[in-house]
Regions:
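Contiguous transmembrane helix-bundle modules in multi-pass membrane proteins
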Residues: 1-34, 52, 66, 244-252, ...
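Soluble non-transmembrane domains of integral membrane proteins
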Residues: 517-608
């Protein structure tokens, strides 16, 4: 009965989504306030029904209701309860229900927190989000119903959750990623609503920007969590593989980064209006592309769900409809909102435009490398692999250029900046950056140009931020001046510092890692990177749904024992899958990583040992960027009720066609 109620709730949510997708838009077109007012209650009801459907599916997992096909395929009586909970979104049908729920949640949040918007604008925004909901709910109900029954042939037990997904990181990684993916639908909806109304002004950018920043922050943290999971779970110490599905989440993040900066220019200066709406369309379109890649069956990946062709065709059709429709609307309406506001060469507008172009080129390069092998295979049957050499050769220089531009962009002013003043600000920053980079290279030991270059760029970005703080607080005193700066400013500073930290982590762990694969018998020791690793053998261990050989490795720094690690080789009994669980001694400046390979004769094992310097800085920097986004979105100016348009408050002239 509970699964049937969940299925009914999805159908009712679809009905409300249809109402939300049609009547408010018609009402905005006709100027009918009653029809426009239907948008908010429809959004509330849709979210409530989706939450109920999700709760029904969760309940089915918790009570081991194997009459539900999705539960039988992804759970087991021996599965711990917390993995039963994460199994709700562990495969295609449940993950799509989670997607629909999060979309409903974003829509509900917009309906609640955007009441200060003009009535027509809010009706259009919620109407566009309703159209997106209709597409996903139709896909969910028609092709991917998670409540399908196995009656009367109910299995006695389930097939168990994929062992790769039985990990804490995979409990939180997909929801965070989906919050970002789906969150870009809000920016998309604001852009389409503004196009429909012909008002891509500073007010639109101000309303849209906090939602976009929050989605960007969630997506960035989700990507970082996925990288962290791959590092410790897959057993060989890698943290980024340029996997097509990794790329599919990274591309909208890059375009989203460009979008939040472009929105800032539109909000402050009323320029880049058409470009900004194009970025909003691109960010959400790339999110849909990621959905297609994961669920269409065109990829073989640890991330991809096995799916039938019908699902792929449905998502591809929806993707083409959204992209084609939005670009057609853009082509028709963009000329209406052209701006005639000018700015100089050495201005923040120019530097942010350069920022945008670099990020879009980087995303386009990744898109080409991801899709070209798929298109070639589909058209000719030829197999081609585009791997890390291609991506690294193009992406790394672009990010170096981005960091160089970023530091200048922080210091320049809106509209125009005197070149002499700018050089006076940048010269001490450059001198100090060179000195710090040389010092860091000396401390690193082995000289490497890449280490010197990235240390220089990281110092350049960090010191430029400090120079800007000093400039903004010089009249009020340091502490009083810092207190007067808004959360948006501090969020920007934290995010930029996070980029510098992440870049340092990437280059230092890439060039400074030690790795060794060897045979180790009980009692045998090996020296690596100044540490001594002593293998004491492996013992049998039983878990709730697996058996394992658990090794013991003691690590010494000189004569001092600093860690005891327990890497495992697990056999998940239901699916007979063998998994490697690494033992990791984590530190701020290095990780000691030990993984078991295959058992050998006389109690010996193949053992892999890594020393990863500064690898945690990669995820620390990503978290700093994400939390910087949340801090910026919490700025008080985004929480103030605005009764007049921002463009009027800023004194900007009306854009002419």
């Amino acid at each position: 009965m509970i699964p049937e109620l969940g299925h009914l709730a999805m159908i009712l949510a679809l009905c409300l989504a249809l109402v939300q997708a049609t009547l408010p838009l018609i009402g905005a077109w006709r100027g009918d306030r009653q029809w426009m007012s239907l948008a908010q209650p429809a959004a509330w009801g849709q979210f409530a029904f989706l939450a109920f459907a999700f709760a029904c599916l969760t309940y089915a997992f918790m009570i081991d209701d194997f009459s539900v096909a999705y539960v039988a395929q992804n759970s087991n009586t021996a599965l711990p309860w917390y993995y039963k909970f994460s199994a709700v979104w562990g495969a295609h049908e449940g993950s799509l229900l989670l997607w629909a729920l999060i979309l409903g949640g974003w829509t509900f949040a917009v309906a609640i927190f955007s009441r200060q918007l003009p009535e027509e604008m809010l009706a259009r925004v919620l109407g566009v989000m309703g159209i997106i909901s209709v597409g996903f709910l139709l896909f969910l109900i028609v092709t991917s119903n998670p409540f399908t029954r196995l009656l009367p042939n109910v299995p006695a037990d389930g097939r168990d959750l994929n062992p790769l997904l039985q990990d804490f990181g995979l409990i939180i990684h997909p929801p965070m990623l989906y919050m970002g993916y789906v969150g870009f639908s809000v920016a998309f909806a604001f852009a389409i609503a503004a196009l429909l109304g012909g008002k891509l002004d500073a007010a639109w950018a101000r309303w849209s920007r906090p939602w976009t920043i929050i989605a960007w922050a969630f997506l960035g943290i989700g990507i970082a969590l996925g990288s962290w999971w791959a590092y410790y779970e897959l057993g060989w110490g890698g943290w980024w593989f340029w996997d097509p599905v990794e790329n599919a989440s990274f591309m909208p993040w890059l375009v989203g980064t460009a979008l939040i900066h472009s929105l800032a220019v539109t909000e402050k200066r009323g320029v880049f209006k058409s470009w900004t709406v194009l970025l909003a369309i691109a960010a959400f379109s790339l999110s849909l592309l990621g959905t297609f890649l994961v669920r269409s069956g065109v990829l073989t990946s640890v991330h991809a769900f096995a799916s039938d062709p019908e699902r792929g065709v449905f998502i591809l059709a929806f993707l083409l409809l959204v992209v084609g429709g939005s670009l057609t609307l853009f082509a028709l309406r963009a000329p209406v909102v052209r701006s005639q506001v000018g700015f100089g060469l050495w201005s923040r507008e120019t530097l942010l435009l350069a920022n945008n172009l670099i990020l879009v080129v980087a995303a386009s390069m990744i898109l080409l490398g991801t899709l070209y092998p798929l298109v070639l295979d589909a058209l000719s049957g030829a197999k081609l692999s585009v791997g890390p050499p291609y991506f690294n050769a193009l992406f790394v220089p672009l990010m170096g250029l981005l960091m160089a531009v970023l530091a200048v962009g922080v210091l320049v002013r809106w509209k125009d900046t005197p070149l002499r003043w700018l050089l006076g600000m940048l010269t001490p920053v450059l001198v100090a950056s060179v000195a710090l980079a040389l010092l860091a290279s000396l401390l690193w030991g082995d000289f490497h140009w890449a280490v010197l270059g990235v240390c220089l760029l990281a110092a350049w970005v960090t010191l430029a931020g400090l120079r800007d703080i000093q400039d903004k607080t010089r009249h009020k005193g340091l502490f009083k001046g810092m207190a007067s700066l808004g959360r948006s400013y501090w969020g920007m500073q934290l995010a930029h510092l996070g980029l510098a930290v992440c870049a340092l982590g990437v280059i230092l762990t890439s060039l400074g890692s030690f790795e060794r694969d060897m045979r180790m018998a009980p009692g045998e020791a090996v020296e690596l990177g100044g540490y001594r690793f002593v293998f004491e053998g492996a013992a049998h261990h039983e878990g709730p749904n697996f058996i394992s050989d658990r090794g013991t490795v003691r690590i010494f720094d000189g004569e001092k024992q600093i860690a005891v690690l327990h890497p495992e080789k697990r056999l998940y009994t239901v699916q007979q899958s063998v998994m490697t669980e690494a033992g990791i001694d984590a530190g701020l400046t290095r990780d000691l990583f030990v993984a078991l390979g295959e058992p050998l004769e006389q109690g010996a094992w193949a053992v892999r040992i890594h020393i990863k310097p500064f690898v945690r800085w990669i995820w620390l920097g990503a978290l700093m960027m994400g939390f910087g986004g949340f801090l910026a979105a919490a700025d008080k100016r985004y929480r103030m009720k605005v009764k007049t348009r921002v463009r009027d408050a800023l004194g900007l002239q009306e854009a002419r066609a």
